[in-house]
Structures are given as C-alpha cells and as structure tokens.
Amino acid sequence: MASCLGIYIDSNIIKYAKITKEKDDLKVDAFGIKIYSDLLQTIDQIVSETFSFKDQISVNITDEMYDYLYMSDLLSKKDLAKAIETEFESLCVEKQYNPNALESRYAIVNDQNDKTKIKVIHVAENKMKINQILQNFDGKRLQNITPIALTIPNIAQTNEKENALIVNIEDKTSITTLVGSKIYDVQNLDVGAQQILDEINAKENSYLKAYEICKNTTIYTMEGQGLQQQENDYLGYIVPNLFTIANQVKDVIGASLIKINKVYITGTASVINNIDLYFEELLDGIKCEILKPFFIEDSQKINIKDYIEVNSAISLALQGLEYGLANMNFNKKNTWEQLKETLGSDITIGGKKGKDNGKKKININLNSPKVKQWVMRDFFRSISTISCLWRACNVYRLWNARKRKRN
C-alpha cells in the first residue's frame, strides 16, 4: 500500500489531496482547499492534518515554458537526445535565454501532420524556482515536481477513439490536447481564475469570500438567461473573463488540424455553476463536461463536486503514485533517495513487478537512522574498496610492464 499527498499551489490558494493505492484500488484519504498568506505554515498544517509526515509529496511547478521540436523518426535514441539538446540551445539563443539557468524535460509523441517525424514536447523551468520549491518542502518527503498541464490528464477517463481538450482554469489557464489518450500539445493562457477572484476580492476584501461567491454563482446561456431570477452583482467580474477564456480556447481549436470531439473543464473556475453549458454554447456545440476523477463516484457522505474542486491536487497525487508521464519530474533526488529506491525495488526473477508470486518479502524501515547509517557506511566503504582495488591493479600493471621492458 502506497500513499501520496498531492499539493497544488497557486498565488493565494492551496489545494491538497492524499491518495492511497492498494493493488489497483485508489482511495482519497483526505482533501481540501486553503486560502493562505503564509505558505510554509500552511504546508506544515496540511502535512500535519493529513498525517503525511512519512508519505511522499507531489507538487506543481509554475510558469514553465513549452517549446515544440520536430525530428526525424529515423534518429537513434542517442542521436535524438543530442539533436533535442542542440535545438533547444538554438532556441535559447534566439529567445535570449540562458540555458544554464534552466532545467528541462521532454516527452516524445508521433507527429499527426507528418508521419515521418516525431514531435518533442520540451518543457523548461527556471532552476531558481525549482530550488525555491525544494526549500519550501525542506525536511519533507518531496518526491515529484511536475507541470500541472501534464499531470491533469491522469484523472481523465479518456477514449482512444476521441480527441479532447482539458481546459484547466486555475490562476492561469492551461489547455492540454489529448489525441486518443496521449498528451499531444499544451497551451498556456495568461487569463484565468485569478482575474475573477482578484476583482471580487477588491470589492469584498476577502479571498475566501471571493471563492465562495464563485461557488454560489450560476451563469446561463443565451437561452436560459430568462431563468435568472435576480441580478448577480458579481457576474460583471465573472462572465467577461470566462468569455475571454472560452474565445481563446476556440482559437486553439480553430488553429489545430486535429478534430476535437470533447472539452473537459476543470480548475478553480469549474466551481461556477453551468460553466460547461456556457462554454459549449461559445464553442459552437462541441461537447463540454466538467472533468471528474475516473476512480471516484458520488456517495451519500461526499458530493463528487467537492472532489472536483481539488482535481489538480488529485492529479499530482496520482503522478506520485506512478501514473502519467514518468520522465517529467523536475525533482533531482539526492543519493539517499536513490539508494532507498534501489533497495525498495522489486528484483524478483520469474514474475511480474508488483506480483506477490508467493515469495517471502523483507520489510526494512529505510527511514530508520540506524539503517541509514548502516547503508551509507557500507555504501561508501564499498566505493573505497573498489577504489583501492583499482589502484592496486594499476600498480601491478605498471610493475608488470616495466618488468617486461627490462627483460
């Protein structure tokens, strides 16, 4: 049984969800939203309230940059990696970026427009921002640092025969294009829920109240406006921003050669009632739905809408439980974490990973200080021994060479 605490951080809001995985079953142990002013204090509070002191944590990065590179599908893996590095360095020169200040990752997909090429989704983040995240979670089991636009598909129930957009309206809006069930493209918009909340907050002087106002607001399509019984004083803040977002989504759809069958809406703005119908009208009838985590069903205790509010955090928790893209983690693990992974790996021969196969298992508490001391001591002792043997071999080789020369 493994658990992961997903924490999604925006400028004023933190969303969190702790997910436990047992075999193929997923369970939400705890979730919630907090408006914060002191980030470190709020993180400590969430870890304490969810009893996640020993659980791994998965968080988002912000303001990451996306670039798209197109390569021949005939390149070897080694040549492809070199070509991607060279292309990105050229982009940095063109855009006047310092490549040494950036940490980058990439994913490879088939180019839908040219079958002889592959498309590289290249993601770069400022190293200073990554280091700040590491500092914010110092002393905690931070496992994953991942772009939210690439983790949000983790919770979608995708259809191999459909192409979809996931419009995640958090502080800023990300648009993730899925071809079948695979990520194909990401577009970030400058407009998002932050504009709505900031404008309401300026009037109410409470970010929490601004969020609650959005939850209690219903917007209507042109046909349903007559059903609105009273004027909502806050629609003037909400509707214009949603209109801007919807039109930019429409532009993305129009510019793509891929036919979009469905649009999923999620994020902070998804708490606004009827937002899916509003978008569907503006997107000329393309089916729009609120994104629901694939493994969660309505219950008498908790309404599924409560889970939907923390979709971003749930997707991050799933990322920490090894769902989604495996090579998008911006967290560089230290030596101890790598050793723990190695010691905890399934090395059973003759069975699939994760299967019990009736064999005995050894349970080692890798967080024990004594175990750490023992492992690290023997680890470095082994390195020292190998180094001594290597030097001895070199001395013997030189001695043997001189002996042959004298003879």
Model-predicted segments: where are they?
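Internal amphipathic helical hairpin motif
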Residues: 63-121
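Glycine-rich phosphate-binding loops at beta-strand->alpha-helix junctions
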Residues: 259-286
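Hydrophobic, leucine-rich alpha helices that serve as N-terminal signal-anchor/transmembrane segments
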Residues: 169, 182, 325-407
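N-terminal phosphate-binding loop and adjacent alpha-helix
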Residues: 25-51
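Primarily periplasmic coiled-coil/stalk helices
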Residues: 187-194, 198-236, 240-243, 352, ...
